[in-house]
Amino acid sequence: GTLFNDINIQRRNSAGVITEQIKVPIEYSAKDKMLLHIRRMSTTDASVQTTLPRMGFVLNGITYDGTRKLNTLGQVYAANTAASSSTLLKQYNPVPYNFDFELTAAVDNAEDGAQIFEQIVPFFTPEFTVSVNLVPSMNVKPDISIILNSTTTEDSYEGDFTTRREIIWTFGFQLKGYIYPDVKSGSVTKSV
């Protein structure tokens, strides 16, 4: 979700002057629950409605990725900076997993949806790579690839004039990550 914290919408008047700038809120929420909340708030009381645009994301699945597997018994070592210099930290190799995420953006007009689309898609060609400090004690900072697999849009343009229009953009992502085992502490062998 942090990757999409800075999505903003600009509304302009007929002269092209920016009249409003909206930071699009994001929450951890499945698409169905987010839509149910929007619809419920739209029908129960006209004076209290959910503000659009808004975004939600959810983890859809985790699968093992054998194509990136490392030697199971391989270990990484690092000096223990939190203790005396005679200790060593060790950790077995991580296990590769793919994490499938879905990002949903709900808007009430096509222009807002297009602006969100334009702030996300250009960074994924089709993948975006970030360096993450996953295990600070071991100084493990791998490059993590996030792949944009799909983009779809739904428009509920049918209905009477009292029905709120919903345009839903759905982005499917796959994060190529790792699960790391525990870090163990041991002593340094000074002579054999």
Regions found by a protein language model. Give the residues of each.
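Acidic-leaning, charged glycine-interspersed low-complexity segments
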Residues: 82, 93-96, 115, 125-190
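Extracellular/virion structural assembly segments
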Residues: 6, 62-63, 79-98, 107-129, ...
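Short N-terminal helix-initiation segments at or just after the protein's N-terminus
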Residues: 35-51, 111-119, 176-191
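"Short basic amphipathic alpha-helical interaction patches in structured regions
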Residues: 69-77, 116-123, 135, 188
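Oligomerization/assembly interface segments of phage tail-like spikes and tubes
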Residues: 53-61, 93-109, 118-120, 165-178
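Homeobox/homeodomain signature
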Residues: 45-47, 89, 163
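Small/polar-rich, solvent-exposed N-terminal microdomains that initiate assembly or binding
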Residues: 1-75
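Membrane-lipid interaction segments
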Residues: 28-37, 41, 71, 76-93, ...
